Regions:
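Surface-exposed loop and turn segments in beta-propeller and other repeat-based domains
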Residues: 25-29, 64-86, 123-139
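Hydrophobic beta-strand positions that form the internal "hydrophobic ladder"
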Residues: 1, 43-46, 98-101
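Predominantly a core beta-strand signature of beta-propeller blades
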Residues: 19-23, 62-65, 117-120
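Short loop/turn segments that connect beta-strands within the blades of beta-propeller domains
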Residues: 7, 42, 50-52, 60, ...
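Beta-propeller blade signature
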Residues: 8-19, 56-58, 62
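Short, conserved, GDST-rich strand-edge loop motifs in beta-rich repeat architectures
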Residues: 1-8, 76-93, 99
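Blade-loop segments of beta-propeller domains
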Residues: 23-38
Length: 139
């Protein structure tokens, strides 16, 4: 659907063995952050950005968890000044064991866990203190 409020997509989880298709998410904005969806290495989780927060969808049970609500910092672009929702600062990707992923706020890097463990600020707030954007660089 395309209207004055932007482009939306629905997400489905498909069992590749049986072809069974289940509706997982409805009305995700595709024009801001749909391309930022990212599957966990084990395929059990997919993250998506909606309503200024990162969420993880468990593909087995269809339950979503808000990963960033308790951080106390914005993970969306606070300086966004346009008539559309602000986008995310992005992610640094999943850990190889699929238990957590790296998420950016404006300056720092956070490790958030899909099992509900408390998030960790990996850069210890040094980016915010120095107003320097710290990001993961794969070499």
């Amino acid at each position: 659907m395309v209207d004055y409020d932007g482009n939306y997509v629905d997400m489905y989880v498909v069992n590749t063995a049986t072809g069974e298709r289940k509706s997982a998410l409805k009305k995700l904005r595709s024009n801001t952050n749909f391309t930022q969806n990212d599957w966990s290495p084990d395929g059990n989780w997919v993250i998506y950005f909606q309503n200024k927060h990162w969420h993880a969808l468990n593909t087995a049970d269809g339950i979503s968890k808000n990963l960033t609500q308790a951080l106390g910092v914005a993970v969306h672009n606070e300086q966004h000044d346009a008539p559309a929702p602000a986008g995310a600062y992005g992610t640094g990707g999943w850990t190889s064991d699929s238990t957590s992923l790296l998420i950016y706020d404006r300056f720092d890097v956070w490790q958030v866990y899909v099992d509900g463990r408390k998030a960790q600020n990996l850069t210890r707030g040094e980016g915010r203190k120095s107003t320097i954007r710290l990001r993961v660089q794969r070499i």
